[in-house]
Amino acid sequence: MGDRGGAGSSRRRRTGSRVSVQGGSGPKVEEDEVRDAAVSPDLGAGGDAPAPAPAPAHTRDKDGRTSVGDGYWDLRCHRLQDSLFSSDSGFSNYRGILNWCVVMLILSNARLFLENLIKYGILVDPIQVVSLFLKDPYSWPAPCVIIASNIFVVAAFQIEKRLAVGALTEQMGLLLHVVNLATIICFPAAVALLVESITPVGSVFALASYSIMFLKLYSYRDVNLWCRQRRVKAKAVSTGKKVSGAAAQQAVSYPDNLTYRDLYYFIFAPTLCYELNFPRSPRIRKRFLLRRVLEMLFFTQLQVGLIQQWMVPTIQNSMKPFKDMDYSRIIERLLKLAVPNHLIWLIFFYWFFHSCLNAVAELLQFGDREFYRDWWNAESVTYFWQNWNIPVHKWCIRHFYKPMLRHGSSKWVARTGVFLTSAFFHEYLVSVPLRMFRLWAFTAMMAQVPLAWIVGRFFQGNYGNAAVWVTLIIGQPVAVLMYVHDYYVLNYDAPVGV
């Protein structure tokens, strides 16, 4: 009986072996499962020897898929593995969830858009935008102030010309540059505060233009000073690297760079840092330029529409909770304002740093197009400020941070000095046009110093990135509401909320 059972078992093993050979075209996993099934213990008919379950006959259909023939199903269908959402699984393809988030975002904002239209109607009025720039159609103070900035450009050029030939001493040249740069800061501010016909929006454009001019001429003065110092040491200066061919013939050295053509190219170039030889693109790409111009036009209209249709009603309805000091309503209005404010800020970033600066760079064949880096991946506040506005960051490092380190300042003092400078310009561009000084923008910028330490100390990785996004989404609406509230209190009666 036992011998018969053993013989039967042997025959069954050979049969299982034969099936696995016939199905040899299948994957190795299937062969292992057949082999495991053949040797798995089971009681035979006589109970004196293990009898394996018959292995399934695996075959391939014409499409190459595995099909199961006659026999029992596989005994093993589980293996050691983690759930996909577990960190140990190594799974990282969440594209479908990302698409779901985008769909939910679109649907949520579509509901807000419809709610806004039903509640307020269509508020977009392109003609009204003109009144933001001009009170009197016969008085154009802001454009006149911007045109007058050429006086300071010519003054800086003439100072450098005389320094190059030795007609001025370095001390006298420094004094004249300080006077010129100080006037650049004070002159437009005086116009914005004293001329009644200039509008707040016109003042912002004028002050922004003069602030850019200040940074450019500061860099122009520094680079020419470095060239003179190098010339004194080496008796011959060439700031560019030695190259051969046509590039070598086009390279400019000091003082040959002191021309109006060179200076005005720098004034219009999308950079704040002066060089004697800028990288140049070989040609103007017309299709690329056309795309950027169309983006500029489209996003300009989109920003104006969102401000008129979405932000203005929300801000107006936020005045009464501020007046009544209704904190729960203030928080609700703050969160309601955060969405359109942040969306407009993101659109402005793309419009200015990608569309506008690339369009200007393409026209001037300016080769360095790194106007921003991946600030959206910032895991710290410091990384965000270092990567979202590259022209300003380069200027701060080159003309402020490193000179302070060379003069013996610590890194912490130098960083604080950079934030102080940035805080001054933020307050300058907000308080002067509104003709009120509340220091909200200055305080917000200086608060970035302890905030950077807190985020860097307690938040890492994705949590740090989330903390940066929260400060961007919530922080800006707070400043906007503070200034708008104070401006309405000073100039108008607070409107009653709807």
UniProtKB/Swiss-Prot annotation:
Gene Ontology molecular function, alphabetical: 2-acylglycerol O-acyltransferase activity; diacylglycerol O-acyltransferase activity; identical protein binding; retinol O-fatty-acyltransferase activity
Region described as Extracellular loop 1 (EL1): 128-139
Transmembrane feature ranges: 93-127, 140-165, 171-193, 201-232, 285-319, 327-364, 411-431, 440-458, 461-492
Spans within the Cytoplasmic topological domain: 1-92, 166-170, 233-284, 365-410, 459-460
Reaction equation(s) it catalyzes: an acyl-CoA + a 1,2-diacyl-sn-glycerol = a triacyl-sn-glycerol + CoA; all-trans-retinol + an acyl-CoA = an all-trans-retinyl ester + CoA; 1-octadecanoyl-2-(5Z,8Z,11Z,14Z-eicosatetraenoyl)-sn-glycerol + (9Z)-octadecenoyl-CoA = 1-octadecanoyl-2-(5Z,8Z,11Z,14Z)-eicosatetraenoyl-3-(9Z)-octadecenoyl-sn-glycerol + CoA; hexadecane-1,2-diol + 2 hexadecanoyl-CoA = 1,2-O,O-dihexadecanoyl-1,2-hexadecanediol + 2 CoA
UniProt record, GO biological process: diacylglycerol metabolic process; fatty acid homeostasis; lipid storage; long-chain fatty-acyl-CoA metabolic process; monoacylglycerol biosynthetic process; retinoid metabolic process; triglyceride biosynthetic process; very-low-density lipoprotein particle assembly
Function: Catalyzes the terminal and only committed step in triacylglycerol synthesis by using diacylglycerol and fatty acyl CoA as substrates. Highly expressed in epithelial cells of the small intestine and its activity is essential for the absorption of dietary fats. In liver, plays a role in esterifying exogenous fatty acids to glycerol, and is required to synthesize fat for storage. Also present in female mammary glands, where it produces fat in the milk. May be involved in VLDL (very low density lipoprotein) assembly. In contrast to DGAT2 it is not essential for survival.
UniProt record similarity statement: Belongs to the membrane-bound acyltransferase family. Sterol o-acyltransferase subfamily.
Subunit structure: Homodimer or homotetramer; both forms have similar enzymatic activities.
Name of the protein this chain belongs to: Diacylglycerol O-acyltransferase 1
